[in-house]
């Protein structure tokens, strides 16, 4: 696969104190759903903020689409990358339908209608944004991000706003967008169960990447994950322990299949 984001030796700190990142390296595959997780204060949201604009003062390089982000104009970069930070988002219009159209340089009715249908926005189009649930506000922000980028969508704290089943539905929707609009999704999560149906999982801690790969292969490294202070999903944790006793060959997520395997 093609690498679309390449982060090399990234160093960043707030007010030149307490480095958040120390020589962080990371690469993101194009047309993937990539999850980033880590303990509290590991820099998950900060990393997305650094990717969301090319104006931060930092050391190291961030290459997107084979070009250093500092070499993009603001207009170019805004079209390349769109980010959703739900806690810091400001809506400019009172109604949902008006907010959807406000920043589109050229109105794309097909894309807009696709997003309205697939993000279940039809029932709220004429509602006042202030009356929306947290989930509907986030869905509106996702739709705006997709409308205004041709490449990368960054989504912060996804599982603070949606339950596990809702996130699975969103992943299905993201895959439609990847196929239809050639997009790449980079998300931050707290609960590792929500990484299983992504393509790649990064775990960051103490300024760097400590694990990276396909989610189930990463989650197999239970000792490293536990030392980082993260909780491994129950079925995965159980599978890993059973593998250690040679009772299981692979991680099994389905309880019935696991029982059947053990009773054979």
Language model feature labels by segment:
Residues 52:
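Helix-to-loop junction immediately C-terminal to a conserved catalytic motif
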Residues 87, 92-107:
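Q-loop/switch helix immediately C-terminal to the Walker
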Residues 208-235:
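Conserved beta-strand-loop-alpha-helix hinge in the C-terminal portion
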Residues 109-124, 146:
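Conserved ABC ATPase "signature" region
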Residues 128-132:
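Conserved ABC ATPase signature
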Residues 60-68, 77:
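Conserved ABC transporter NBD signature motif
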Residues 225-264:
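ABC ATPase nucleotide-binding domains
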Residues 37-39:
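The feature captures the beta-strand-to-loop junction immediately N-terminal to the Walker
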């Amino acid at each position: 696969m093609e690498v679309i984001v390449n982060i090399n030796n990234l160093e960043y700190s707030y007010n030149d104190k307490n480095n958040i990142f120390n020589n962080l390296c990371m690469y993101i595959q194009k047309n993937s759903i990539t999850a980033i997780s880590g303990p509290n204060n590991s820099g998950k949201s900060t990393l997305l903020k650094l990717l969301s604009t090319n104006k931060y003062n930092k050391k190291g390089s961030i290459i997107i689409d084979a070009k250093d982000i500092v070499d993009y104009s603001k207009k170019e970069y805004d079209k390349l990358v769109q980010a959703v930070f739900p806690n810091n988002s400001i809506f400019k219009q009172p109604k949902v339908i008006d907010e959807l159209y406000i920043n589109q340089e050229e109105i794309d009715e097909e894309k807009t209608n696709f997003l309205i249908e697939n993000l279940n926005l039809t029932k709220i189009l004429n509602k006042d944004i202030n009356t929306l649930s947290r989930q509907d506000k986030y869905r509106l922000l996702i739709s705006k991000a997709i409308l205004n980028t041709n490449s990368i969508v960054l989504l912060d704290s996804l599982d603070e706003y949606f339950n596990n089943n809702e996130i699975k539905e969103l992943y299905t929707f993201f895959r439609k967008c990847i196929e239809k609009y050639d997009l790449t999704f980079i998300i931050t999560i707290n609960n590792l169960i929500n990484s299983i149906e992504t393509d790649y999982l990064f775990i960051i801690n103490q300024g760097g990447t400590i694990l990276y790969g396909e989610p189930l292969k990463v989650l197999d490294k239970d000792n490293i994950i536990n030392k980082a202070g993260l909780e491994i999903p129950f079925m995965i944790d159980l599978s890993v322990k059973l593998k250690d006793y040679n009772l299981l060959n692979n991680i099994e997520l389905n309880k019935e299949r696991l029982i059947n395997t053990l009773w054979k």
